[in-house]
Amino acid sequence: MHRLKQRYFLPIILALLCAGLGFWGCAASRTPDSESPAKIETAPPIGSIIPVRGAITHLHESDKKFYTVIDIVIGDHFQGTLPDDIDSITVTGPQGKLALGKRDFNYHERFRDFWISIPGAPESGTYTFTVTSGKRSGSATDTQSTPITIPLPDIRTFSPAAGETITKIPPHFSWQAVEADVPLYYRLDIKDMQDNYIFRTGYVKDMFSAHAPSSILKPGQSYRWRVRVVDGANWIELDNRAQNQWQQITVAQKLSEREYTYRVPPEINNDWQTSSLTEAGVDSEKIDELMHRILIGHDTVKNVHGVLLVKNGRLVLEEYFYGTHRNHLHPIQSDTKSIVSILMGIAVEKGFINSIEQPVLGFFPEIAPANLNADKRAITIEHLLLMAPGLQCRDSYRYKWRGLSEMRQSADWTQFMLDLPMAETPGTQFEYCNGASFLLSAIIQKATGMKTLDFAEKHLFSHLGITELRWPANPQGITIGWGEMRLKPRDMAKIGYMMLKGGNWQGKQIVSRNWVNESTQPHIKAGWYKYGYQWWRGNAILDNRVIEAIWAWGHGGQFIFVLPALDLVAVFTAKHYENPGFSERTFNMMNQYILPAFKLSLPPQQKISVDKKVLETYVGTYNFEHDGQTEIVNIILKDNRLHGYSNDEELVELHATAENRFFGRSKDIGGFKLQFVKDGNGEVFNFLLHFAPQFGLLRVPFDKVE
């Protein structure tokens, strides 16, 4: 065990985390980043095809003139060196081939983007973009609607204004709305004085302000910023855009931290009823502390994009950071899997699928799978739901998502999955497998005759009032079941609250209560967690009580937590892709801030007094050995009350519920329970520590050494 920190019980957590989660890593597949057009949402088949996407845009530039902008982006799966290995680029418009070649295009390495800006507005119609590399070629099309003029953002409304000095962090940028007859999406761009982008948000509908990360701006340096306004949610969909001239600002040598101010979430179009934290009986001090740490970009909580809390059916907290917004369609990554589970329940309930015990191969009679044997014939829908089909997926962080990458590059994803060799007997071993979730979507499409997206919109999203989302399909037209969905955070909370209420939303039963109960049961062991039907299940400890938790878990820090005992739904969005242990941050936020803030929802825990002579028998030094390392905990008496500490760090009071049973709360592991154990001679020889540092309930023995 490697000691990364010296805090109360934390080294234990780190060791057990590596041992318990190392086999599957970080929950879900990495999906494209909306901020970079270089990331292709759907994988091309392998072979001679170059993966390419293209877009044509009508630009209203800051010089008040109009331009035609062409972007041609080469996908990640291109095998070659860019830009050199692209031999030719041709563009054909409504009136025929344009007089353009590769040498006319600029190349942006970060985005793998060949681009050009041509004076004049584009013609309406369809454009085809073709690239070649040796004998390989690829093409894409984009249709330009009738160009409209989006007004330029008014720099007179900008804050900070041109020439202004920033004195507070995180820096806050704001502007007024642009008036137009179409929905508009805004993006904040920031560059350094060397013309390098250092920050930009995604395109967000009706976003008029944004905080940028504190770390991007250096004291005493100058920067430039602007706002883009477009008529689409992402670069491939928009037709028209406008952007103001760059505004130069300076950062003061000495900066002060911006204070967090709580505001009750607004009620919007009968979306959510809201109330204040105080009205909900929540300790707002803990929430304020967490929000402030996120706001200033503290290392332990940096890159958190959004936090939403629903208590007793009311939205009581809604905060967004780093340029995100309530209208932002955020990547929810593998939270998508949990939604696919709901859709499977609806499909069964409505009779499209007879039973989850049906064999998977029966849905694909046109496929003759390789490596066919009795085990493969025995794979059922339930095995896919449990991540236990027994297939050799090689599809987790441990394998660097090798299986997922190979599937995305295959000519037929369903065939690829069904061809995989067997590694285990179906239903016996949890092994994280994105392809299993993809097959669930493929089965829904086969059984219903509808794309999974269309089925979801008809039978789930429409009933929840979810009208805006993105959920792409693969090259064969099958909705991607493992991830890549984008939802607004408020809509993520609807999914969670519907599950909390047993499949019911505002009095309407969307999916049966039986399915909700069954899909969230602990069917199979998954590391130190349990796994249901594409839902995770674990525990937290709050004031000596073990609290059941159910959650959807998406790569990068996307979570939908459901805690029935507290009538609480917690939603987190983030961009925690830089570290395979990213999930630790979110669980720590839950344990250290969110759960303690809601402890008033539970009846007070009864505490008892224990005789001082008994307490004295517990005093001493205890250790726990793991992987050649020793964790030491000292138990002491202070003011006639029992306390524990490790490595001279946090002193934690132990509250008695019985003569030998205690509980407490550490800032590092959250709530815990502790039981002293005596030998046959009545001597205390160890204590048992029960804790749930990342919602995995653990039991660790500490032996008394002196």
Annotated model-derived regions:
Residues 362-365, 371-466, 489-503:
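Active-site-adjacent helix/loop patches that line small-molecule binding or acyl-intermediate pockets
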Residues 217-235:
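Beta-strand-rich modules
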Residues 288, 313, 331-356, 384, ...:
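Active-site SXXK
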Residues 601-706:
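Peripheral terminal and inter-domain segments
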